[in-house]
Amino acid sequence: LEYGPEYQDFTKEVQSFCKKYEGLSFTDGSNNPLGSSGGSGGPKMSRSEWQKTLIENGYFARSVPKEYGGYGGEADILKSRIIAAEFSKSNTPGPMGGQGIDMLVPTLLEMGTKEQKEAYIKPTLHGEMIWCQGYSEPNAGSDLASLQTKGELVGDEWVINGQKIWTSTAQYSQMCFCLVRT
């Protein structure tokens, strides 16, 4: 596949960025499964600083509005593929992934209230708030139709009663989004 001039220029831009950060290592440890552990011999920064650097340069959260901590650009699948390809060719870590970024942020952008978007999207994208998902239950597994955990609105707060198991990345998370019966 040969790209047109706009995408050839963009590819060179991404390659230059990757070269600048080649061998990046994280100052906050490498025991987090939500992204690459980084490399060695290159610059050093925290995962949160790296997330912000990627966003500021348009290499992560490209179509998330700036007001919620994203880059604020148009969705462009070809540019996204170029970014993924060039990062995978280099010794430059990509962004953190995880349940919050991959599942919660798109849901909040589509269905969340303004308050929810303001409270959760930016810190999630910036790696300051790590999420796990609470779907599986002891007698239901991941059969969501069989969920037993209940959510009840008491005053202005939701009270959750039930159990969740197999909660991916729970040991790294500050927050959990879960499915409950209401």
Predicted feature locations:
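Active-site-adjacent elements of ketosynthase-type condensing enzymes
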Residues: 139-147
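Amphipathic, small/basic residue-rich leader segments at the start of a protein or domain
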Residues: 1-98, 115-126, 130
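Short, solvent-exposed loop/turn elements at beta->coil junctions and helix N-caps
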Residues: 67-69, 136-140, 165-166
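N-terminal glycine-rich flavin-associated loop
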Residues: 95-115, 141
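A short core secondary-structure module
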Residues: 157, 161-182
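A structural signal for short hydrophobic beta-strand segments in well-ordered beta-sheet cores
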Residues: 149-152
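Conserved protein kinase catalytic domain
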Residues: 84, 105-108, 121, 177
